[in-house]
């Protein structure tokens, strides 16, 4: 008997985080009697007077939204980090060296923003036009440039802008209205910091950027590519943890949104739409995920720019159907991450789907014929 990647347990290395993932493809055959999520039906109206993100409504802070017609950004009234707060009083004491060694603390300052993708309450990326997603990409870019300028000219404590979206109740999203968030901190958060560290080490050892080599390898092998265009490709990473996890990778070395050409902005909007349509079509549901952008820090140094390579991570939880999700528990919390479906199997399923026609649009077309 020879080793079979589609049936035998093995571990795969993630060079971005210097970690390993256990792959157990034979477990995909096991029956499931556990928790099931509610199917993602979207019967919401275009506008909801009770939604604090819809145009013209009043937010919990008492501020009223304008009658916006495209994207809309506002400062989060309940931010995770704040600009105005005192620095912690850190005392140095030789008599308690153990406490100082183990109980480390530092203050964190910054600002948090909410980004409404559309004035329509019941839309998400896969049902938006490419031009509407393009407006979101431009908004991300404008926010990056604005905060970079404020840090430089007004000495605001802005170092890294983490843009992300939690879509669906399965990912903890409490509001259906299409929106994302942007948290700007005075330091680089742990996940991108780990990536930067490994990018620098890889280039020092091999003379090339890790993601440059990875993009070229995936383009050569093709088996994990879901879709691509002139500027970007979408892959299920070789080391993926979540069942249908993907990365959106720029084909050239672009440090951040700030360095995009107009064509690259168009291509990013196009590939986000293509990927998210495939996600919804997979189980014919509004597919939940957490998504985020990884890019250069604000006002990056020459070394920081060299280490950066723009990419996006999509982490969707659904595993077998619209109602069965993956949980990171037990061995995965105490040992290491584990997955059942191989990255290649997941990519095959996603690439077989349409990235142009949403399942609801197809359903409407079929119903109109009857």
Curated annotation (Swiss-Prot):
GO molecular function terms attached to this record: UDP-glucose:hexose-1-phosphate uridylyltransferase activity; zinc ion binding
EC class name: transferase
A cellular component annotation (GO) from this entry: cytoplasm
Cofactor binding annotation: Binds 1 zinc ion per subunit. Zinc binding seems to play a structural role.
Annotated positions binding UDP-alpha-D-glucose: 60, 76-77, 166, 181, 326-329, 331-332
UniProt key word Zinc: yes
Protein name as annotated: Galactose-1-phosphate uridylyltransferase
């Amino acid at each position: 008997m020879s080793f079979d990647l589609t049936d035998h347990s093995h571990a795969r290395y993630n060079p971005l985080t210097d970690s390993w993932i256990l792959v157990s493809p034979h477990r995909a055959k096991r029956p499931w009697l556990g928790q099931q999520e509610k199917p993602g039906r979207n019967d919401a109206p275009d506008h909801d007077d009770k939604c604090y993100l819809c145009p013209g409504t009043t937010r919990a802070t008492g501020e009223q939204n304008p009658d916006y017609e495209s994207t809309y950004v506002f400062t989060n009234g309940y931010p995770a980090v704040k600009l105005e707060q005192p620095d912690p009083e850190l005392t140095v004491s030789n008599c308690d060296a153990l406490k100082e060694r183990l109980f480390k603390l530092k203050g964190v300052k910054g600002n948090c923003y909410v980004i409404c993708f559309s004035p329509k309450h019941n839309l998400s990326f896969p049902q938006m036009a490419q031009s509407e997603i393009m407006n979101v990409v431009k908004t991300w870019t404008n926010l990056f440039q604005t905060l970079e300028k404020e840090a430089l000219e007004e000495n605001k404590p802005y170092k890294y802008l983490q843009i992300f979206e939690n879509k669906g109740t399965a990912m903890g999203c409490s509001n259906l209205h299409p929106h994302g968030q942007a948290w700007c901190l005075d330091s680089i958060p742990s996940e991108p910091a780990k990536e930067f560290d490994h990018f620098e080490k890889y280039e020092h050892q091999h003379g090339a950027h890790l993601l440059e080599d990875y993009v070229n390898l995936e383009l050569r092998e093709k088996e994990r590519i879901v879709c691509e265009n002139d500027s970007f490709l979408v892959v299920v990473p070789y080391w993926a943890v979540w069942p249908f996890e993907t990365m959106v990778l720029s084909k050239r070395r672009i440090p951040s949104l700030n360095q995009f050409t107009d064509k690259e902005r168009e291509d990013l909007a196009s590939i986000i739409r293509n990927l998210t349509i495939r996600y919804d079509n997979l189980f014919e549901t509004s597919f939940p995920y957490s998504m985020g952008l990884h890019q250069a820090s604000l006002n990056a140094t020459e070394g920081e720019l060299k280490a950066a390579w723009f990419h996006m991570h999509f982490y969707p939880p659904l595993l077998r159907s619209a109602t069965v999700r993956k949980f990171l528990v037990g061995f995965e919390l105490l040992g290491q991450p584990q997955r059942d479906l191989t990255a290649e199997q997941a990519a095959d399923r996603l690439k077989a789907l349409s990235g142009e026609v949403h399942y609801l649009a197809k359903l409407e077309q079929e119903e109109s014929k009857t």
